[in-house]
A protein has these predicted regions:
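Conserved catalytic core of sirtuin-type NAD+-dependent deacylases
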Residues: 1-245
Length: 245
């Protein structure tokens, strides 16, 4: 279960840290609410275009790669759930990542007429000079396929994340402040179902007291060390994640 701290190590600023330069004087909620988008869609679209450019220049770091390698060796016994919208887990090789807050690399119709993941097959909305580009199906503006303030998490994605939390034996909570709900409730759900929690974060978090282990430091350093050998313990236990972090 990963958060913004993992992406920060790839040079991607958090939402509020990105409010610098030309964007420093804007109210964050003006740039990340449906009301703000409807009031000034061109402004919000340009903001997300700037963020997409920064993300495109970033690369997965050792934490992303170690998680993908663990998943590759362990198969369906590992589920990657993230609060990040940058797609770096997928670029590192993780498959079926549960993106709780959506993806900045996708767009969807503001009025909800199409499939968010495939809003317009064959249509390269990133190259459309119109700001924002229109939905080719109904003509309404396209919006970033991310969760804005005041919006619900994608119900199907969150339901799958809850099921994974309830079934897991071990949850690594990496690079998240564990303050943004409802996503932050997943470690508690896993703990109540009997899982062991290991927190990897530079700073204290509200769930440290629930954890079987807390590792202070950067994910890019600690996660490769933590996951080295974990797939072998998983295999030795016949498919159950090992009880030792």
């Amino acid at each position: 279960f990963t958060g913004a701290g993992v992406s920060a190590e790839s040079g991607i600023p958090t939402f509020r840290d990105a409010l610098t330069g030309l964007w420093a004087h804007y109210d964050p909620e003006r740039l990340a609410t449906e009301a703000g988008f409807r009031a000034d869609p061109a402004l919000v679209w340009r903001w997300y275009a700037d963020r997409r450019a920064a993300i495109g220049a970033a690369q997965p770091n050792p934490a992303h790669r170690a998680i993908a390698a663990c998943e590759s060796r362990s198969g369906s016994r590992v589920t990657v759930v993230t609060q990040n919208i940058d797609g770096l887990h997928a670029r590192a090789g993780s498959r079926g990542v549960l993106e709780l807050h959506g993806s900045i690399l996708r767009a969807r119709c503001l009025e909800g007429c199409g499939d968010p993941a495939h809003v317009a097959p064959g249509y390269d909305w990133r190259s459309d000079p119109r700001v924002p580009p229109p939905c080719p199906r109904c003509g309404a503006p396209l919006r970033p396929d991310v969760v804005w303030f005041g919006e619900l998490l994608p119900p199907d994605v969150f339901a799958r994340a809850e099921r994974a939390a309830l079934r897991c034996d071990l949850m690594l909570v990496v690079g998240t402040s564990a303050l943004v709900h409802p996503a932050a409730g997943l470690p508690l759900l896993a703990r109540e179902a009997g899982a062991r929690i290991v927190v990897v974060n530079p700073e204290p978090t509200p769930i440290d007291d629930l954890a079987a282990g807390v590792l202070r430091g950067e994910a890019g350093v600690l996660i490769p060390a933590v996951l080295d050998g974990l797939p072998h313990r998983v295999a030795e236990r016949g498919g159950a994640a090992g009880s030792e972090p």
